[in-house]
Amino acid sequence: MNYDLLTVDMKSLDWSKDKIYLGATAGLYGGVNKDFYRFDSSVLYGYAAGAQEGSPVFNWSDMGLGTSEVHLGECTDGRFVVLAASSNQTEVLSYEMAVLTKGADEREILSMVSLSATPGLVQAVSDFNKTNDRYKVELTEYFPYAQNVTDEEWDNAIINLNTRIISGDMPDILDMSHLSVQIYQSKGLLEDLYPYMEHDPEIRKEDYFENVFEAISLDGKLPYLTDGAAISTMLAGEDIVAGNDGWTIQELEKVLDTYGANSINNLSGASFLKIMLQTDGSFIDWNLGKCSFDSPEFVKMLEFAGKIQESSQNSFGGTEMSESYAAAYETVLSVYHITRYRNYYNGNLRFLGLPGGGGEYHVIKPEVKVGISSSSSRKEGAWEFVRTLLTEEHQMSCMMLPIHKRAFDKITQAAVDGKSVWTWIYEDGKATKEDVELTKQLLNSAAYVENDNQTLESLILEEAREYFSGARSALEAAERIQSRASLYINEQM
């Protein structure tokens, strides 16, 4: 969310007409050497009176600090006192206090680029920079986390990044969130991380939910690593889907016809289409540079999205569930999401996954996507950072489900004991062992991964809305999507 700062005209005792555009802002504090300071997810800025722009003071991750629950004060000598929280899913927040002063850092720099780094990624970089004696990760973001960004600004940022890469200015480490992993992989820009894992004496694949690595893999190579994952899926009551192992779009359509237009929770036509575009790779062959958005299968998907679009215009909204909901789309971040729905369906809960033709279709949503540049001259150092994502200690601080089995067991046991940071989701505060087992089965059975390509998604949704509004038929919209998507894909090859 973006913010503006308004000041008070003390003569008129009214708001000043001039306002300062702050952009995404996580905190605002008065200063000594500056009139005030503000910070976003990555940088602290200082502002002089009347200035429209602040000057960067320091980067949080450079200092080894996260931006969760930050309190800040400036001393008269220019030093800063910072109190910052450190997260762990099994306990309440703990705090660290740091006194920051200017100094030299002689460690070797590892460059890292992100379009918009999540708080979890910033924390991972901060933790590494706080503890590693040899290397320091220097994180550059195009946009702070949660800043409002137009499609044009986003596309221009991707063009700028790709231009830098073409000119040889490739960072050592890439945050692949919001970038097309398939395109970067097909161009040979990303290291295969399987050999790094195999030669690391402290990492054993069997300690993890290995299906996560398999889902991420492309052509037998591992383009990035994550530390945690959520599961995108659909669920319903046992009586509604008895005998089904997964479902097709046609079967999901019957739910709407049988139980009413507003019977699927957390789903609109546009969101359904976006979810399927991110998870169903059958419409694009990146190796051949071809797509099939004019196929009967995609037209049917578009028609179903239109039916949901009509129903969602009069839906219940918010996150509260009504007795009218026969099914729901859910992103399972913790065991408490399972607990909540199990109670709603009186224990008769079935996870069928997203609609597809091959049985249960559960999708992994990685918490982070961190890859190593194939052209980096500091691959050893880059791996020093990337490997920290796999450590049990680090994964205890993830906000999603850890993919390390021991970390998973510890955070889910905390949920059973009522000591998880996620207790606010479920008012009773405790999950059951059955909830834990179902969560584990769900994570262990997910065989697909969510892939982002915001430019392509925006293009497709723009044309889909023409169908939703009645301006075009589903077939006409699909043909226009096919034409524009083909052009975009050819430009990327």
Predicted features along the sequence, with ranges:
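Hinge/lid segment of periplasmic solute-binding proteins
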Residues: 178-233, 348-355
